[in-house]
A protein has these predicted regions:
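Short, well-ordered beta-to-alpha junction loops that form the rim of enzyme active sites
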Residues: 73-74, 245-247, 317, 325
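Conserved acidic/glycine
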Residues: 1-54, 60, 251, 256-340
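Glycine-rich ThDP/TPP pyrophosphate-binding loop and its adjacent helix/strand module
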Residues: 117-314
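Phenylalanine-focused residue identity feature
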Residues: 4, 14, 19, 68-69, ...
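Cofactor-binding active-site loop characterized by glycine-rich and histidine/acidic residues
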Residues: 30-33, 40-173, 191-197, 202, ...
Length: 340
């Protein structure tokens, strides 16, 4: 697959591709929200509204089939950009046995390990050592050159032991890893001033001895410039890169949460703006896309999402009485469990 981020960062094709992933993810997640509120989805629904610019830029900057990407719960845009088909998402949330989780998880823990996307771990921060381990394994196999491993976390995850251990190991080993911190100002409902004492999370980069970047996560052009540079430095041997994106999630922690703890002052502030609307203006103002093109994309993606939802709704859900438990049997002989 073509790597648009290679060479000229402000590439027209690159930016259009990023925006398309942002838009496709937003339309998909709006549909998921409606399905959840209608009682069609069992379990939680976690959206990436307001964080699409960061997520889609990273997913587009990585090379499918070569790089590794461990997405966060709010990374539908990045998943889409990295090649995950929409049907994987709708099948998972709607419990289809045809989905990547075979109906066993109606949530966001799916992955595409064969394509370099490990399954998402709910304990945020835990994917930092996972990506470090995947990269280290490739070094031991002699196939690390030219690869990058990336993951996204939230501001709260920077307080975890897994984040510290994983980033410290990656720094010592000079692994080509990019960690994107989406600082949406609240770790669930815990504000930044109760989460860390430094003025800016990017200051942590100096302590670990890794590259550090800070970017306005609501600005597509800024995200494209900074994230592509971080990926480039990691790929060229510069070691781990920490990118802190300042933004605000535009919904609650999940669709079960109204986010009442976020003040109107914060919501109406600079980072409360919608990155999709910002990106749309940037594309049009810089003659990278027309209003008619964007309208056509919206219509196309809405139809694509509707088809994916309809297909998943027609498919069977798991039948526990006829479950063969092959997920366990592929690793351990089923007779061992029976004997015990």
């Amino acid at each position: 697959m073509q790597n648009f981020a290679e060479g000229v960062v402000m590439n027209r094709d690159f930016l259009r591709s990023v925006f398309q992933s942002m838009l496709r993810a937003r339309i998909l997640e709006n549909k998921l929200s409606s399905l959840y509120k209608a009682g069609k989805i069992v379990g939680g629904v976690y959206l990436g509204r307001g964080q699409e610019a960061v997520s889609a830029t990273l997913g587009t900057a990585l090379i499918q089939g070569t790089d590794f990407f461990a997405p966060l719960i709010r990374d539908q845009a990045g998943r889409t950009a990295f090649g995950e088909p929409i049907i994987d998402c709708t099948r998972t949330y709607l419990g289809s046995v045809e989905g990547p989780m075979r109906g066993r998880d109606g949530n966001i823990h799916r992955g595409r390990p064969q394509m370099g996307m490990p399954a998402m771990i709910s304990h945020l921060g835990a994917q930092v050592p996972v990506i470090a381990g995947m990269l280290f394994a490739k070094r031991l196999q002699g196939t690390l050159t030219g690869r990058v491993g990336a993951t996204c976390i939230g501001d709260g995850a920077t307080s975890t032991g897994a984040f510290h251990e994983g980033l410290n190991l990656a720094a010592v080993e000079r692994l080509p890893m990019v960690v994107i911190v989406g600082n949406n100002q609240f770790a669930y409902s815990t504000p930044n001033n109760r989460q860390f004492a430094c003025a800016d999370l990017v200051e942590k980069a100096r302590g670990y001895g890794v590259g550090g970047f800070s970017v306005d996560g609501t600005d597509l052009l800024a995200c494209a410039s900074v994230i592509c540079e971080a990926v480039k430095r990691a790929r060229e041997g510069g070691g781990p890169q920490l990118v802190v994106a300042r933004l605000l999630r535009l919904s609650g922690h999940g669709e079960h949460d109204d986010g009442a703890y976020v003040s109107s002052e914060v919501r109406n502030g600079h980072y409360g703006r919608d990155c999709i609307e910002v990106a749309m203006r940037q594309l049009v103002d810089n003659h990278l896309a027309t209003v008619d093109e964007i309208s056509a994309w919206q219509e196309e993606f809405a139809e694509e999402v509707q088809r994916a939802v309809a297909q998943a709704q027609q498919e069977a859900v798991p039948d526990p009485y006829h479950e063969d438990w092959t997920a366990l049997a592929t690793r351990f002989p089923l007779t061992n469990f029976v004997a015990q």
